[in-house]
């Protein structure tokens, strides 16, 4: 299971990356401590269902994407998502179907991730920041935006901007602050998350 307090891992296997991208999709706009166990329940159930259907214990070791593709073929993905309470169901279903088509998450690009329904700039950057050491771009969440307002950028929005120009404008400000502090974007982001998530 993904530990929401320790998401940074630059040495994940393909299977672990698959679980992590599903986690990233699920927690968008939701509480990670609630969504992480739901994903675990979904993956366990998905493995059980596909293993029983194929009458093979080998499916118990299948990757998350293998299980999703098998559930799609069985016509049971939506059922298992409801069983695990992975809502909003239609949105998650579309995201899971699309993301399971990505062959290699170790080399996936930001633009390829953005083609998946339900993955925006924040989710894509979150995934890449916490799975690739060389990716040092901010994900503008409510905590970072609150931090920016506290730093005097009072025009920083309260929620993640959907306009790309606005997003990049505030992302660059945050990158500059991190550099001035001698920190990586990911490290400063984690510090801010720990500090601001306690106060909200």
Residue ranges and their predicted role:
Residues 4-7, 19-27, 75-82:
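Glycine-/proline-rich flexible loop or hinge segments
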Residues 29-37, 49-53, 103, 134, ...:
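Amphipathic alpha-helical interaction segments
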Residues 1-19, 89-100, 106-108, 115-200:
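C-terminal accessory module of base-excision DNA glycosylases/AP lyases that mediates lesion recognition
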Residues 14-46, 168:
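Extended cationic-aromatic binding surfaces that line active-site or macromolecule-binding grooves
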């Amino acid at each position: 299971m993904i530990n929401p307090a320790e998401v940074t891992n630059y040495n994940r296997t393909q299977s672990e990356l698959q679980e992590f991208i599903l986690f990233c999709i699920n927690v968008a706009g939701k509480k990670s401590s609630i969504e992480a166990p739901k994903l675990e329940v979904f993956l366990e159930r998905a493995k059980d269902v596909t293993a029983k259907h194929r009458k093979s214990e080998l499916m118990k070791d299948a990757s998350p994407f293998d299980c999703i593709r098998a559930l799609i073929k069985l016509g049971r993905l939506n059922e298992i998502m409801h069983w695990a309470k992975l809502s909003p169901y239609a949105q998650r279903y579309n995201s899971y179907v699309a993301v399971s088509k990505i062959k290699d998450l170790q080399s996936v690009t930001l633009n390829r991730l953005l083609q998946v329904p339900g993955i925006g700039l924040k989710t894509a950057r979150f995934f890449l920041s916490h799975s690739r050491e060389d990716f040092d771009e901010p994900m503008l969440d409510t905590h970072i935006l609150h931090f920016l307002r506290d730093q005097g950028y009072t025009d920083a929005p309260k929620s993640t901007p959907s306009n790309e120009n606005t997003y990049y404008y505030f992302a660059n400000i945050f990158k500059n602050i991190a550099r001035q502090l001698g920190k990586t974007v990911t490290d400063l982001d984690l510090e801010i998350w720990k500090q601001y998530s306690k106060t909200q």
